[in-house]
């Protein structure tokens, strides 16, 4: 083939390739135009797909998925419809308590990033339950955990995480700077109450959905403090109790009515011979019942019940099955304070059912060890020590600590009644064990009208940690 023939052949091949490329490009343009015309004709059409269930990390979310045909973007989000938690239901009838959660925080914290905490509690909205806790601004098995036996410091904060999970920097949400706290959900948003500051001038900061809405200054200038468990919400209003004054003598106690984070009413209890600290409160048939700690002179628990106008009644649980720690052996009760071993105490709870009462208490009379639930069918009004049911949840050889109530509203459970639940703090470290830190994990139980079991669900961490050696 001579040079001219080669040139003609190469030119012909290039021309054919060019023509094919042009045809493909024209086809592509026509395809894009047709596709655009179809989308333009349906530009404002939005289709709603069926609900989908996504299961991840043991949590089940119900999602509504929206597909916008015009740009094919898919947006999936959890149904967060707001409802007002009525709080008008009575407590569900129950026969015992079923294990609900266990976070194993201290065990996991020996190798994982887990917060040093105390005072954990649980609160539920109509969508979820969360564990709230007071951190010490430190992680387990780290140098900053040294000295965390101290209750009040500027490093403490109220945080929360999904119930049953160990509290870590990766799953926890900051709520408030606080060394004493409470939180609850009214169906529309989270109310958090965080107290911080000096002993003689602490301030409670109220937040609603994360925004500061109100502050309450210490009125007695002697360690303003609140529940260390959930507040109670009824028909859009939430209620909490605060204490200011001596821990070993008469103090001042106030009930606050709060709507969307703003205090709308408050009263001071007329209780010269009673002592109310760290109350565990729950709604019941439109009213609020609180069972508290008498740190002054009672080994049985004081209670106060009030309506939405803050008209209140008060007294002590009459049963000879005593609920505080320290306490004497069960015996003759009193509808006022039982003075034997009445000094000091521990946060606790009870649930009233008419004249009967479920009493939660440590198994030990003198130390924060073990935990049991006792049903006394006439213990709210009678002073004998006879009881009908006892359910063990922590063995007397294992550490316990604070305990408190929380409820699951019908809007969450689908039941026609208020489900009673409780949590138990499992304290580890100082002052009882040879560590440089104090922390804890938690377990929780909910009332059921079916079979339950006696067992022990202890913290289970093997101490000391590396940092302690």
From Swiss-Prot:
Region called Head of neuraminidase, residue ranges: 91-469
A matching Pfam family: Neur
Region (Involved in apical transport and lipid raft association): 11-33
Transmembrane segments annotated in the record for this chain: 7-27
Reaction(s) catalysed by this chain's protein: Hydrolysis of alpha-(2->3)-, alpha-(2->6)-, alpha-(2->8)- glycosidic linkages of terminal sialic acid residues in oligosaccharides, glycoproteins, glycolipids, colominic acid and synthetic substrates
Membrane topology: Single-pass type II membrane protein
Cofactor(s) needed for function: Ca(2+)
Annotated residues for binding of substrate: 118, 152, 277-278, 293, 368
Family statement: Belongs to the glycosyl hydrolase 34 family.
Protein function: Catalyzes the removal of terminal sialic acid residues from viral and cellular glycoconjugates. Cleaves off the terminal sialic acids on the glycosylated HA during virus budding to facilitate virus release. Additionally helps virus spread through the circulation by further removing sialic acids from the cell surface. These cleavages prevent self-aggregation and ensure the efficient spread of the progeny virus from cell to cell. Otherwise, infection would be limited to one round of replication.
Designated name of the protein: Neuraminidase
């Amino acid at each position: 083939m001579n040079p001219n023939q080669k040139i003609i052949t190469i030119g012909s091949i290039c021309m054919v390739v060019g023509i094919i490329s042009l045809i493909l490009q024209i086809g592509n343009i026509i395809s894009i135009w047709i596709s655009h015309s179809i989308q333009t004709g349906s530009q404002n059409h939005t289709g709603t797909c069926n609900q989908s269930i996504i299961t991840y990390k043991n949590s089940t979310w119900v999602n509504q998925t929206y597909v916008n045909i015009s740009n094919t973007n898919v947006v999936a989000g959890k149904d967060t419809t707001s409802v007002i938690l009525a709080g008008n239901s009575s407590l569900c009838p129950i026969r015992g308590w079923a294990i609900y959660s266990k976070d194993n925080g201290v065990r996991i914290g020996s190798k994982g990033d887990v917060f040093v905490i105390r005072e954990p509690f649980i609160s539920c909205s109509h969508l979820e339950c969360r564990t709230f806790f007071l951190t010490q601004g430190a992680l387990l098995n780290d140098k900053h955990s040294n000295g965390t036996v101290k209750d009040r410091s500027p490093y403490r904060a109220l945080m929360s995480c999904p119930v049953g999970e160990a509290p870590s920097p990766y799953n926890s949400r900051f709520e408030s700077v606080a060394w004493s706290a409470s939180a609850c959900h009214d169906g529309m948003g989270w109310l958090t109450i965080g107290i911080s500051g000096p002993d003689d001038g602490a301030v409670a900061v109220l937040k609603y959905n994360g925004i500061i809405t109100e502050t309450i200054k210490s009125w007695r200038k002697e360690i303003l403090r609140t529940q260390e468990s959930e507040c109670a919400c009824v028909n859009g209003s939430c209620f909490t109790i605060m204490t200011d004054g001596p821990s070993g003598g008469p103090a001042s106690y106030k009930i606050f009515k709060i709507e969307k984070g703003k205090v709308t009413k408050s009263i001071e209890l007329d209780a010269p011979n009673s002592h109310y600290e760290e109350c565990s409160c729950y709604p019941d048939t439109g009213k609020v019942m609180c069972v508290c700690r008498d740190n002054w002179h009672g080994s049985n628990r004081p209670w106060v019940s009030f309506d939405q106008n803050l008209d209140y009644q008060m007294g002590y649980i009459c049963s000879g099955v005593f609920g505080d720690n320290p306490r004497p052996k069960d015996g003759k009760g009193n509808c006022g304070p039982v003075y034997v071993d009445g000094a000091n105490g521990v946060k606790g709870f009870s649930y009233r059912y008419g004249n009967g009462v479920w009493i939660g208490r440590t198994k030990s009379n003198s130390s924060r060890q073990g935990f049991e639930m006792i049903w006394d069918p006439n213990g709210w009004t009678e002073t004998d020590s006879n009881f009908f049911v006892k359910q063990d949840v922590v063995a007397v050889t294992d550490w316990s600590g604070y305990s408190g109530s929380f409820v699951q509203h019908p809007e969450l459970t689908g039941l026609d009644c208020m489900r009673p639940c409780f949590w138990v703090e499992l304290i580890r470290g100082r002052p009882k064990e040879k560590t440089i830190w104090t922390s804890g994990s938690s377990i929780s139980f909910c009332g059921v009208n079916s079979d339950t079991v006696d067992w022990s669900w202890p913290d289970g961490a093997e101490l000391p940690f590396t940092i302690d050696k």
